[in-house]
Regions:
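C-terminal engagement/docking regions of AAA+ P-loop ATPases
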Residues: 1-2, 240-317
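Pre-Walker A (pre-P-loop) alpha-helix and adjacent loop at the N terminus of AAA/AAA+ ATPase modules
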Residues: 7-53
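Conserved C-terminal "switch" segment of AAA+ ATPases
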Residues: 7-11, 24, 174-246, 273-277, ...
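Walker A/P-loop
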Residues: 39-76
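A short helix-turn-beta junction within AAA+ P-loop NTPase domains corresponding to the substrate/partner-engaging
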Residues: 68, 161-178, 196-199
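Short glycine-rich substrate-engagement loop in P-loop NTPases that contacts/grips substrate
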Residues: 77-106
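Conserved AAA+/SF3 P-loop NTPase catalytic/coupling segment centered on the Walker-B
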Residues: 82, 104-129, 143, 158-167, ...
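AAA+/SF3 P-loop NTPase mechanochemical coupling elements
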Residues: 97-106, 135-152, 163-172
């Protein structure tokens, strides 16, 4: 199949996927889009939102529609790396046998990732980066495709272990999950307080997802789009010669080269899902906020003057 035909097929599958997901999830269009873009782009996602906004349900629903295995890990202060990676046990033959942990799954929901100590966070982040884990000196590859969706609660920050910048950088997207609108909440309450059950169809499988991930990397990009993405990221760096006034006034730390890479991959995927065979600058802009918002560090002045991260990114674009 030619790449053009494959993109057309991806568009059809994407629409079918969204229809299936919306049988269960009411609203949250942007969140669903961004999670699907990160899956097809071979990235990982950090969902930030207060409890009860269907973050877990969303991941569960997506894994059903994609026909992938799914595990949920609830991160707590006493969780150890071996609890998520797995450990060696002595079997009845008196031999050591590796017992796989919950990380060995296609989709892993890391719930409240900031509630666990750095030691356990780093075990998860090694898995995200290397797509394999190390236990008792042996390396074990994780199932492919492998996708981590971590959640974080923006309130109740006491007793948490905030993710350092280097670890946040591993996430392709930082997705804000907002409260539903009045009409959406009406629909949610109506659907969840009755005894109706929804059966979901499997739209694509793991092999097709990996084919689509390869397809997206093959999509060509014009030099002006590439230049726009790299320049946008460079504008976030305070000591860059082209840094605008807003960067010097409100940003302490800018984004690294990984942001430029993700902007291009995200733009390619956004273009493909919308039936375009090559991304333009609008596609870069469409994915800029979730890619940049966790890679920039605001200073005290920005916080004091109420300059949100999204507002700064908008002005930079």
């Amino acid at each position: 199949m030619s790449d053009k035909a494959a993109i057309d097929q991806l568009v059809v599958h994407y629409k079918e996927l969204k229809n299936e997901i919306h049988k269960v999830i009411v609203g949250q269009d942007d969140v669903v889009d961004q999670v699907l873009i990160s899956i097809f782009s071979k990235g990982h996602c950090l969902l930030v939102g207060v409890p009860g906004l269907a973050k877990t349900l969303l991941v569960n629903t997506i894994s059903d529609c994609l026909g992938l295995s799914f595990n949920r890990i609830q991160f707590t202060p006493d969780l150890m790396p071996s609890d998520i990676v797995g450990s060696e046990i002595l079997n009845e033959k008196r031999e050591f046998q590796f017992l796989k942990g919950p990380l060995f799954s296609n989709i892993v929901l890391a719930d409240e990732i900031n509630r666990t100590p750095p030691k356990t966070q780093s075990a998860l982040l090694e898995a995200m980066q290397e797509r394999s884990v190390t236990a008792a000196g042996n390396n074990y590859p994780l199932p492919a495709p492998f996708f981590v969706l971590a959640t974080q609660n923006p309130i109740e920050q006491e007793g948490t272990y905030p993710l350092p910048e280097a670890q946040l950088d591993r996430f392709m997207f930082n997705v804000w999950v907002d409260y539903p609108s009045f009409s959406e909440e009406m629909a949610i309450v109506k659907a969840t307080t009755s005894n109706q059950t929804v059966s979901l169809q499997r739209i694509v499988d793991g092999e097709q997802i990996m084919n689509y991930q390869d397809l997206i990397r093959r999509i060509p990009v014009a030099d002006n789009v590439l230049e726009y993405a790299v320049r946008l990221v460079a504008k976030t760096r305070v000591n860059d010669e082209n840094a605008p006034k807003i960067t010097k006034d409100y940003i302490t730390w800018g984004a690294g080269p990984r942001a430029s890479q993700y902007l291009i991959i995200g733009a390619k995927c956004h273009a493909a899902l919308n039936g375009k065979y090559s991304p333009d600058i609008e596609d870069v802009k469409a994915v800029a906020k979730p890619i940049l918002r966790h890679r920039l560090v605001r200073n005290y002045r920005a916080e004091a003057e109420g300059y949100s991260m999204d507002r700064i990114i908008e002005e930079l674009m």
